[in-house]
């Protein structure tokens, strides 16, 4: 997508070229005189990024990073900050990922965006499970998708990355994770202590030459780092070329489709994953190593299911796929009724044309 207005005015073409290898075809990008800093969080005062999400406890970082980039491009294309919310789980599983394997092939996921696209979160909400399970998006999800026309790899050189960041939008980055990233609180990150613990995929949304770093959006929740972001040093040397030499930073381009579908939006306010409810009082779950489903909410005593809804006329509450309660009266809530053990609480919201889901697993103690 060729960026217009403000972004184009800050670029002055020079004669040298930077090579960018494309997943479906080859392409070149002219080297540019770049501004000292740039951020998709501040385009003429507008923040086109969406809220930081939390992938835990699942290994779905590839699709969280892709969707973070895509959501920003959607808002920029419409010149509207309307908080689109795409289904990372749909993209992860339908593109061939599994929790047992611990990843989805990033190139397969990008190709899936070209061939099929990704629907909104209401078609396939993230249940925050750490295991594989049967999955299926809502019927008609194909009519609610956003697609891209191409993707490619960016040369692993600072100026090439910064230029592509302006030209194409937020970039998807593969990198190695060391123990000290978990305790990051601020400043420009370079690996200093601890062993390598694995790989991760995140989204570059900006850069700052004065600090010598990229601003990176993570998917570990807004309570980590700098409200869910971190600054990565240009010279950190953490790029992971898992897909061959020269891979590690991906761009996507040519966003189109149903960017703003007429659908209800529904999200649980309580119960939510990773939290415990004791006679209505809520706190983050402790003793997480106990032999109960990881991340599932824990319920002790009376608890009401409470929702955040938009564009909604009616909701249905289900426990383990059994319809328990229907209401057309906002605010939509229901006193949870379930026996001891693990359960799945699903809500289905309707407007005049479509339906959307949200799901949370929970364990009832009493």
Predicted regions and their residues:
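Catalytic-core signature of thiol
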Residues: 25-270
């Amino acid at each position: 997508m060729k960026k217009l207005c403000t972004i184009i005015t800050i670029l002055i073409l020079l004669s040298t070229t930077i090579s960018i290898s494309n997943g479906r075809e080859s392409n070149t990008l002219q080297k540019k005189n770049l501004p000292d800093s740039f951020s998709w969080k501040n385009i003429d005062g507008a923040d086109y990024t969406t809220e930081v999400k939390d992938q835990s406890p699942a290994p779905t970082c590839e699709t969280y990073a892709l969707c973070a980039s895509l959501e920003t491009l959607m808002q920029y294309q419409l010149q509207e900050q309307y908080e689109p919310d795409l289904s990372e789980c749909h993209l992860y599983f339908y593109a061939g990922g599994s929790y047992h394997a611990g990843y989805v092939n990033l190139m397969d996921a990008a190709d899936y965006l070209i061939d099929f696209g990704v629907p909104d979160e209401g078609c396939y909400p993230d249940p925050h499970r750490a295991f594989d399970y049967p999955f299926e998006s809502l019927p008609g999800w194909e009519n609610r998708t956003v697609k891209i026309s191409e993707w490619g790899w960016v040369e692993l050189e600072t100026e090439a990355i910064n230029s592509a960041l302006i030209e194409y939008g937020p970039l998807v980055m593969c990198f190695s994770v060391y123990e000290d990233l978990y305790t990051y609180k601020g400043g420009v990150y370079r690996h200093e202590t601890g062993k390598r613990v694995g790989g991760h995929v995140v989204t570059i949304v900006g850069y700052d030459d004065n600090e010598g770093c990229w601003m990176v959006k993570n998917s570990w929740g807004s309570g980590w780092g700098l409200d869910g972001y971190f600054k990565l040093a240009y010279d950190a040397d953490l790029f992971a070329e898992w897909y061959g030499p020269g891979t590690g930073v991906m761009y996507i381009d040519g966003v189109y489709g149903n960017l703003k579908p007429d659908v209800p939006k529904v999200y649980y306010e309580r119960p939510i994953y990773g939290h415990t409810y004791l006679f209505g009082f809520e706190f983050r779950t402790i003793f997480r190593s106990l032999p109960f489903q990881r991340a599932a909410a824990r319920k002790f005593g009376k608890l009401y299911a409470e929702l955040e809804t938009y564009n909604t006329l009616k909701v249905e509450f289900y426990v383990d796929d059994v319809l328990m309660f229907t209401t057309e009266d906002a605010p939509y809530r229901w006193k949870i009724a379930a026996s001891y053990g693990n359960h799945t609480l699903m809500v289905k919201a309707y407007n005049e044309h479509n339906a959307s889901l949200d799901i949370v697993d929970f364990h009832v103690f009493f």
